[in-house]
Amino acid sequence: MNKEYTLLDLYEIYCEAMPRYPLAYERFRDILHKDNSQIFTAESSETIIGFVVVNGNSVVILCVKKEYRHSSYGKHLLIMAEGFISASYDEVVLGGGGLFQGVPCDEGEESSVPFFEKRGYNADFTSVNMGLTLNEKSVQKLKEIPRPDGVTYRFADDNDREKLLAAVKDAQADWLPIFEENKDAPVLLAVCGDEIAGFEMVEEYGGMFFSDNEKHGMIGCVGVTHKYRRRGIGLAMTAEGSLSLYERNCKDIQLLYVERVAWYNKLGYEVTSRQWMGRKKIQDIMF
């Protein structure tokens, strides 16, 4: 990055380009300072026009000022990112979860998806984010969700570690690394007798997109073991987790990478954004 420009300059470009995805400056700064992140910029003789952030094989953010769009600046930034990634990886991923899962493609806004499709990117699916504003109405709805008999809900402690990992392996083995690496993350359990029937991560400071000083919670990795499925345990557990965030004075709750949209609708959650999960093999890149 040209030393003439500051992170605040980049932040201002981001805020203009991504109004639907607000970030506090400190959060933006931390993303750009993440280990091994690389920043490339597009500049005119007078000002910075856009930038792209790369981490690993992911294009984390690509932003161009509105008045300079459709003028090849985005294309050249992407070429720089792809060239850097190609030195170490065989695939380029758009988003990658450092900030965005993929490419924002929300209704009512100009989509960047055609820009990436034109350059050989493909996506198998579109990821959905959801949210719930915590107020009297939404809390009442959560309280009305039926609670199955014989199930209690509590947060996990160190004594639950072995059983928790076994439950995760049974319900969704792909999540094991997440729970192993984040052993201090708060996890709400649904317990039947001496068995863990369900689990979910509940974080009062886990929200991603906000620019105020309020608390924004997040719920993730919601799972129920095979033995206890189809009893309403997952829905009740998520209602309990949501209420626990309300009790900790969270303003809202954010969900990322949602697949079961209709299921979360039952709890009052609504779709807030959609992201196109684009990627491209290095051999498809032309320099």
Language-model features: locations:
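A conserved beta-strand-loop-helix scaffold within acyl/acetyltransferase catalytic domains
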Residues: Y21-S44, I48-I61, K169-V224
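A short, internal acetyl-CoA/4′-phosphopantetheine-binding micro-motif in the GNAT/acyltransferase core
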Residues: S58-S71, G98, I219-R229, E259
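Short, high-confidence coil segments that cap the C-terminus of an alpha-helix
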Residues: S37, A87-D90, C250
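Conserved hydrophobic beta-strand within the GNAT/NAT acetyltransferase core sheet
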Residues: V59, V92-G96, V103, I219, ...
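A structural microfeature
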Residues: G50, F125-V128, A197-G198, S273
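Acyl-donor-binding surface of acyltransferase catalytic domains
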Residues: I79-P148, G278-K280
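Short amphipathic alpha-helix that is part of the acyltransferase structural core
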Residues: M1-R27, S127, Q140-D174
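Conserved acetyl-CoA-binding loop-helix of GNAT-fold acetyltransferases
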Residues: H70-S86, C221-V224, R230-L243, E247, ...
